[in-house]
From Swiss-Prot:
Chain sites annotated for binding NADP(+): 10-15, 155, 159
Purpose of the protein: Catalyzes the conversion of dihydrotestosterone to its inactive form 5alpha-androstanediol, that does not bind androgen receptor/AR. Does not function as an isomerase.
Biological process (GO), any one: steroid biosynthetic process
One term under GO cellular component: endoplasmic reticulum membrane
Modified sites of kind N6-acetyllysine: 350
InterPro entries linked to this entry: 3Beta_OHSteriod_DH/Estase (IPR002225), Lipid_A_modif_metabolic_enz (IPR050177), NAD(P)-bd_dom_sf (IPR036291)
Transmembrane segments: 288-308
Protein name: NADPH-dependent 3-keto-steroid reductase Hsd3b4
Active site: 159
EC code: 1.1.1.270, 1.1.1.210
Amino acid sequence: MPGWSCLVTGAGGFLGQRIVRMLVQEEELQEIRALFRTFGRKQEEELSKLQTKTKVTVLKGDILDAQCLKRACQGMSAVIHTAAAIDPLGAASRQTILDVNLKGTQLLLDACVEANVPTFIYSSSVLVAGPNSYKEIILNAHEEEHHESTWSNPYPYSKKMAEKAVLAANGSILKNGGTLHTCALRLSFIYGEECQVTSTTVKTALKNNSIIKKNATFSIANPVYVGNAAWAHILAARSLQDPKKSPSIQGQFYYITDDTPHQSYDDLKCTLSKEWGLRLDTSWSLPLPLLYWLAFLLETVSFLLRPVYNYRPPFNRLLITVLNSVFTFSYKKAQRDLGYEPLVSWEEAKQKTSEWIGTLVMQHREIGNKKSQ
């Protein structure tokens, strides 16, 4: 695939930024277009530093702007679509989440057909497969097993329907008579440097005597390090453009995890931050069934108040279920078809993430020292 080019949507996000950074190392890549709704000054500076032999073009635009998407896709060989409204708690309106995740994906697929882009990789989520109950056990699941989310919550529903649209679009005829080839990568929880979930957890703990609130004690998950998640996208882009590999990949989805040990989300938070004195809350917490029904009551209150007041519960049944389920996946199919092997070991991922958490702790202490002076 000599002289190829790639558009990355959501390029200012946690995963998108890492994909762009890895793409510039691709020897035969001529141009990367980095599309994001709004880039901060720091993000733009970091992207400008990536200018090597590969041209990096920064594009500001909305995933719901069809004309913007057509311009962004023009002349591209591949699209990696990471842009999404990630909102399991439902803080944004249902329509907003559906528009960004589902309508935006369909508009981008249409733009690919119009602009003759033959390769489309979609960043999906394991939440399209469940878990549908915290009592359900899904252990080392693989693609041949039929797991599908039954939640009506806008985030898992929109991701599920968007993935279906992407896979159904495989084989679409492009405007020039060519063929669109698609695949989807179902990512487990992504951790690593610059993870907003981890950042919020750490900052909240630092304001609470370095105590991390427990909310995921009963889960068993296999999160994926951001560098490995990004690497899977690079391999998918390569493989879909390889005439020998592409036929077995077209229209397929893949679970993407790595060799991070299976553990609860609470244990992961503790492991990554304990070097800096952060520790899990040891106080009593509500039993899981009671917590689940409390979430149901809060959702009911939110529904009843909706005509007069927009009440957003602090947690919901989806979040309680996701954070307290046995829900792990195998990456063997990606290994077989894409040649995927984690680039970064658990030990290295743990060290890099811990060092980054250390910078957050230092920043917090510096701010505290300035206030006390």
